[in-house]
Amino acid sequence: MDNEAILRKYKRRQILIDVLPFIALAALFAVLCITVQSKGYRLDMYLKIVFNEGVVLAVVATGAVFIYTLGSFDISLGASTLFSATLGVMTYNATNSLALMILVIFAVAVGCSLLSSVLASVFHIPVFVTTVAMMSVLSAIAAQIITTNGGALGGISIPSALVKPLDNMGFKIAVLAVFWLICFFIFDFTKIGRRQKFLGGNPVCAQLTGIQVNKYAIIAFVMAGVGVGLGAFLTLIYTPSVTATTAGSIGMNILVAIVFGGMPISGGPRSRIYSALVGGFSYILLNNILKLLIDSNVGYGVSQIVSAIFFLAVVYVTGLNYRSQMLPR
């Protein structure tokens, strides 16, 4: 086979892999609609659930793309979301100030991400160790605050009337769209995104060209922190209360969602900012479909198994694009 034929085959495979996440999203949406209607449930109710869960996951995952592009990961983002929301609620209950609550949420979210980046980048502690430690510490502190102030079951809350004007599709779409467009611009049209892709693809070569690894790692974690802050605020808008289990699964769901969106698990030049958006809603759709199809008594375990199978299949398919003798184009 000549070089031109190899190149054509490579490009066809690349195009197919790029469009697969969108096809999967449309297919999952159709399956959800058919399943809900066949069981006689209200479609508008399920679509609202999918939308509210998907927006939070997509927002946090969009910020996390910057970390995953470096070939790194952060499984403490769910705990950071819980911790930020907890301190935000405590701030409002102490001051009755919505503006101060929002400020605290974002300050805590970015601060937690900065702490993770400093431990990983400056002190050279492995990212896995850092994020696991942060996840455990933040979850424990948040749980202690919630238990002390509101009880283990009841949790802590803010008045629902405070955020009810914001609990609508238009506001949430606007938040997601603005944040995604900002991240899209930074990721695809500035040197920050280009250099982070370079670092994820070949860190040794990137360092030899003079790119500062620590600088761009810190920027990545800051962007993830902003996403966590938005996710915590949107969570409080949808459910104006916080319990010890709030946002508990977001950390791992982000990893699955980004891969579902077609982004390689190793990051690098094939990273795409739309992966968080497409993958986030795809994962939520799949999760709700499985809840509808599987008996509730065993649903959670089976759902996790099916999600894991989907995850491995997507990783395998996206990995096909890199098993060639050609450099990424």
Predicted regions and their residues:
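Transmembrane helix-bundle core of multi-pass membrane transporters
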Residues: F123, V127-F189, I218, T239-A244, ...
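Inter-helical junctions in multi-pass inner-membrane proteins, predominant
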Residues: S38-I49, F187, G227-I258, R270
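Cytosolic-side transmembrane-helix boundaries in multi-pass membrane proteins
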Residues: M1-V31, L181, G201-K215, L286-R329
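Transmembrane alpha-helical segments in multi-pass inner-membrane proteins
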Residues: V242-I305
